């Protein structure tokens, strides 16, 4: 079992045991890349659209006669080779960008990310993180006790006060276990996780 320090708000530190299979995995860059690209691809709205030569507005008149001008032959102004013409092989909203990753691979990739964060001292465990009011000022004062910036806070469940107090703060994200994703974990300089969230992550990812 791996031991990680768990800090309380008053500065006390207690070592807690965590699962090797979740927090002590060998870093697998290829697997992490696969689950990140899958997440980003599945998040695409797929609404991009371009017009082909048959969809561009304009006359279908031939621009000049076929022979005798010395110039290359040409048809309508919607010719894809001309400026303002249609596009060859235009993108359509019917494209499917979905990339599937098996559940076992996704869980292994998330464990790899958590292990690497702990290895690089970017994962900070705390006893709990709660605020008594929705005022952002009090939330920032509490966060200042841990001396962290650009941080993602993972809790077992987000209470309304914590969510409302933190939502307008730049470079801060508060999320519960069910909503964590690989891109967010890799985007922040520090990841703060509560003790209850550690237990829940172990039960979900093992």
From Swiss-Prot:
GO BP annotations listed: translation
Keywords: Ribonucleoprotein, Ribosomal protein, RNA-binding, rRNA-binding
Region (Disordered): 47-71
Signal sequence, renumbered to the chain: none
Keyword RNA-binding included in the entry's annotation: yes
InterPro entries, per the entry: Ribosomal_uL4, Ribosomal_uL4-like, Ribosomal_uL4_dom_sf
Keyword Transferase: no
Gene Ontology MF, one: structural constituent of ribosome
GO cellular component, as recorded: ribonucleoprotein complex; ribosome
Function: One of the primary rRNA binding proteins, this protein initially binds near the 5'-end of the 23S rRNA. It is important during the early stages of 50S assembly. It makes multiple contacts with different domains of the 23S rRNA in the assembled 50S subunit and ribosome. Forms part of the polypeptide exit tunnel.
UniProt xrefs under PANTHER family: 50S RIBOSOMAL PROTEIN L4, LARGE RIBOSOMAL SUBUNIT PROTEIN UL4M
Assembly information from the UniProt record: Part of the 50S ribosomal subunit.
Family recorded in the similarity comment: Belongs to the universal ribosomal protein uL4 family.
Protein's UniProt name: Large ribosomal subunit protein uL4
Gene this protein is translated from: rplD
């Amino acid at each position: 079992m791996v031991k990680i320090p768990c800090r309380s708000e008053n500065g006390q530190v207690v070592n807690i045991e965590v699962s090797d299979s979740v927090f002590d995995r060998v870093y697998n860059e290829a697997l992490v890349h696969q689950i990140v690209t899958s997440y980003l691809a599945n998040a695409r709205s797929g609404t991009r659209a371009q017009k082909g030569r048959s969809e561009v507005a304009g006359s279908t008149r031939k621009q000049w006669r076929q022979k005798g001008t010395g110039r290359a032959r040409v048809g309508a102004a919607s010719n894809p080779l001309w400026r303002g013409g249609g596009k060859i092989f235009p993108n359509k909203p019917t494209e499917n960008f979905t990339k599937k990753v098996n559940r076992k691979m996704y869980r292994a990739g998330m464990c790899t990310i958590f292990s690497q964060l702990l290895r690089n001292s970017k994962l900070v465990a705390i006893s709990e993180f709660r605020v008594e009011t929705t005022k952002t000022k009090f939330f920032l004062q509490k966060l200042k006790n841990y001396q962290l910036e650009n941080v993602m806070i993972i809790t077992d469940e987000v209470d309304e006060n914590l969510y409302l107090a933190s939502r307008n703060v730049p470079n801060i994200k508060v999320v519960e276990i069910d909503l964590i994703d690989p891109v967010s974990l890799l985007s922040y300089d520090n990841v703060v996780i509560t003790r209850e969230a550690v237990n829940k992550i172990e039960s979900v990812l093992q």
